[in-house]
Curated annotation (Swiss-Prot):
It catalyses: thiamine(out) + ATP + H2O = thiamine(in) + ADP + phosphate + H(+). InterPro entries: AAA+_ATPase (IPR003593), ABC_SmlMolc_Importer (IPR050093), ABC_transporter-like_ATP-bd (IPR003439), ABC_transporter-like_CS (IPR017871), P-loop_NTPase (IPR027417), Thiamine_ABC_ThiQ (IPR005968). The gene is thiQ. It is found in: Cell inner membrane. It comes from Shigella flexneri. CDD domains: ABC_ThiQ_thiamine_transporter (cd03298). This is Thiamine import ATP-binding protein ThiQ. Belongs to the ABC transporter superfamily. Thiamine importer (TC 3.A.1.19.1) family.
Amino acid sequence: MLKLTDITWLYHHLPMRFSLTVERGEQVAILGPSGAGKSTLLNLIAGFLTPASGSLTIDGVDHTTTPPSRRPVSMLFQENNLFSHLTVAQNIGLGLNPGLKLNAAQQEKMHAIARQMGIDNLMARLPGELSGGQRQRVALARCLVREQPILLLDEPFSALDPALRQEMLTLVSTSCQQQKMTLLMVSHSVEDAARIATRSVVVADGRIAWQGKTEEVLSGKGSASAIWGIQG
């Protein structure tokens, strides 16, 4: 279970403050206007930002000040951060060992994830030889191979065409269910959120302004839709 209690980030001396509980295996969408604090929330969970106050626990363990490399969290961005001089296999392998010294079990795990992502025939290629969708599959494979209990997505598929974006969202949702991972996904699209998340959190002005069923946001009725700017 992920629990944030009054986690506070000072943005130009204006506090963003979040309290949130997410159960293990839950898939949650984080919605809200641009600049509301959605990415800040994910970066606080991942450890890329250090809170001024508050606490963050994962499965009852305090990770408020744990550095990103030691948190039980993986994060995927719109910019996939693949290393252009490394092959697909090497980029995925970094998720298992930064020195790329993989034992037989790790090699098998890497290839199993590649097969799951549908990129097992691309392992010898460089990122520059891949399409945008293929590069995001590689980046996702690198996240999943780490087998961390929490996966954070900061709009990684927003640049893809609608059909490919839906395919990637389905792949993420299925993978998280298989590995019993908790998923938090930032999105500007309520429709994308509804595809994989039954629960949504709406962020506004650096606060969690609403949380509940995604279908309520999609319906265009109620307070969540008003914050989000949807009218039914």
